[in-house]
């Protein structure tokens, strides 16, 4: 069961790493497409911030057999550009699971895009910053992993919004 869960987590990581930021390649993680959103499964919560609609899927709306270690998936949908960011947030994980999952994510990212580069707030990123990963720990020694994949027109959406839309999820990292 534990190995199966790690395999599924690896598939999540691969899914988040497996897109091109090329505007002509409309593929996005989880079988979604960058750009206009016509139909999505019923979310746990929808909230709006200026030109961005956050569509949040919590564990209650995620298939437990396919995403057992997922706490949330957040879609950032821009008014004019459509879907421009997908954020995957793990449940809190013990050391061994976090280490194995991060090793798999780094291996996949490095294989696809080359060596990761350091980003802001102690993140690592690939593909010119289009895919970012970060991890935090709580006071009980458990760890949470965040991965964000950006769409091809995220900069335009961020300009309309007044600041980078990645700032929203990076606040969860709690790092200056």
Q: At which residue positions do the language-model features occur?
A:
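Gram-negative bacterial Sec-dependent N-terminal signal peptides
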Residues: 9-16
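Compositionally biased P/S/T/G-rich terminal and signal peptide-adjacent segments
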Residues: 57-82
């Amino acid at each position: 069961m534990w190995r199966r869960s790690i395999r599924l987590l690896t598939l999540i990581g691969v899914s988040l790493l497996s897109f091109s930021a090329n505007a002509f390649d409309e593929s996005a993680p989880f079988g979604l497409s960058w750009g206009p959103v016509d139909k999505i499964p019923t979310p746990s919560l929808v909230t709006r911030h200026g030109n961005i609609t956050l569509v949040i899927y919590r564990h209650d709306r995620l298939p437990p057999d396919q995403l057992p270690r997922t706490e949330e998936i957040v879609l950032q949908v821009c008014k004019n550009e459509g879907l421009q960011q997908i954020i995957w947030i793990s449940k809190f994980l013990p050391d061994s699971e976090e280490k194995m999952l991060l090793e798999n994510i780094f291996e996949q990212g490095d294989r696809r895009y080359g060596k990761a580069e350091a980003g802001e707030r102690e993140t690592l990123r690939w593909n010119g910053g289009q895919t970012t990963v970060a991890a935090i720990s709580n006071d009980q020694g458990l760890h949470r992993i965040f991965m964000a994949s950006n769409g091809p027109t995220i900069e335009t959406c961020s300009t309309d919004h007044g600041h980078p839309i990645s700032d929203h999820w990076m606040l969860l990292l709690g790092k200056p």
